[in-house]
């Protein structure tokens, strides 16, 4: 990645970022892998947007093919009003469960949109298009239950990318719940043994957009890293640890330290294999 600074005048500077490009270096196919990709920018029950989340998901679909080696027929993408609670749950309980080859399939989950924690921080939720922030238990997807449903399909591995936060803040300036004026710190939770989870921010932080690139900040550097930027030792493979290190360093820099991506699980898991 290169960052260019153009000075139109002594007092102004415009930073521009390279366009994302999933083409380029070829990767080895991952025949049995599959991906469920979800992005919700605009919601039915709240005016607070998750800016660029839908385009993040649509572009990540190309990276799933071109950089994770997944066949297009084994990728399911849900965006905006197509990512309601029913559609999300059926995609996991029906489509994913049928598509997984037990102990052979690597599963990839990408979610960009709003997340929320319970008032005590003990539960983490992903908000579907038709979810109501004030009724999390009834209308949102509990992260632990989502992971349990995926794990029940018995895949070989599961890698989850979450461009969301759980503090109740948004990619803009709004709070998801007006009656909750302060950010809630989500408590760290355990994950199943074969899961690796990369999240955009710490439990009490906001997952921000990268306005210059018109993507979520985490999503932009995630995909830029998958192009090859994250291959720190130049061995033609990108591990979860390498990708996380690249994303974390760039997000911390661009957010001036206010957003710190986190990694749970196997840092040595190879995600991208260049030919």
What are these regions (language model features)?
Residues 32, 86-112, 116-175, 242:
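Caspase-like (clan CD) cysteine peptidase catalytic core
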Residues 17-19, 23-26, 230-275:
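Caspase-like cysteine protease fold
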Residues 31-48:
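Short glycine-rich His-centered loop
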Residues 44-58, 62, 209-213:
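Glycine- and acidic-residue-enriched helix-capping/strand-helix junction motifs
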Residues 4-12:
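Short acidic/polar inter-strand loop motif in beta-rich domains
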Residues 36-41, 78-82, 110-114, 127-131, ...:
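Active-site-proximal beta-strand/loop segments in catalytic clefts of secreted hydrolases
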Residues 11-22, 57, 61-105, 137-138, ...:
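Functional beta-strand-loop-alpha-helix junction segments that form "active/interaction loops"
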Residues 158-220:
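Extracellular S/T/G-rich loop segment that most often corresponds to the catalytic His/Ser-adjacent loop
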């Amino acid at each position: 990645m290169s960052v260019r600074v153009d000075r139109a005048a002594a007092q102004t500077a415009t930073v521009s970022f390279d366009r994302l490009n999933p083409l380029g270096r070829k990767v080895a196919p991952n025949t049995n892998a599959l991906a469920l990709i979800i992005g919700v920018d605009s919601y039915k029950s709240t005016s607070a947007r998750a800016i660029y989340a839908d385009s993040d998901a649509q572009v990540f679909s190309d990276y799933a093919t071109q950089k994770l080696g997944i066949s297009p027929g084994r990728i399911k993408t849900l965006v905006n009003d197509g990512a309601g609670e029913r559609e999300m749950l059926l995609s996991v309980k029906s489509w994913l469960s049928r598509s997984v080859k037990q102990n052979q399939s690597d599963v990839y989950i990408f979610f960009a949109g709003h997340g929320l924690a319970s008032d005590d921080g003990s539960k983490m939720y992903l908000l579907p298009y038709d979810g109501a922030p004030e009724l999390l238990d009834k209308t949102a997807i509990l992260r632990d239950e989502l992971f349990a449903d995926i794990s029940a399909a018995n895949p070989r591995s599961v890698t989850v990318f979450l461009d969301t936060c759980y503090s109740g803040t948004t990619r803009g300036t709004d709070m998801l719940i007006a009656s909750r004026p302060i950010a809630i710190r989500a408590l760290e939770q355990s994950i199943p043994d074969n899961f690796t989870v990369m999240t955009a921010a710490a439990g009490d932080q906001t997952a921000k957009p990268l306005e210059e690139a018109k993507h979520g900040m985490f999503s932009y550097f995630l995909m830029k890293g998958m192009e090859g930027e994250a291959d720190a030792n130049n061995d033609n493979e990108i591990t979860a640890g390498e990708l996380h290190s690249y994303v974390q360093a760039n997000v911390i820099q661009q957010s001036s330290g206010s957003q710190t991506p986190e990694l749970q699980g196997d840092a040595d898991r190879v995600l991208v294999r260049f030919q």
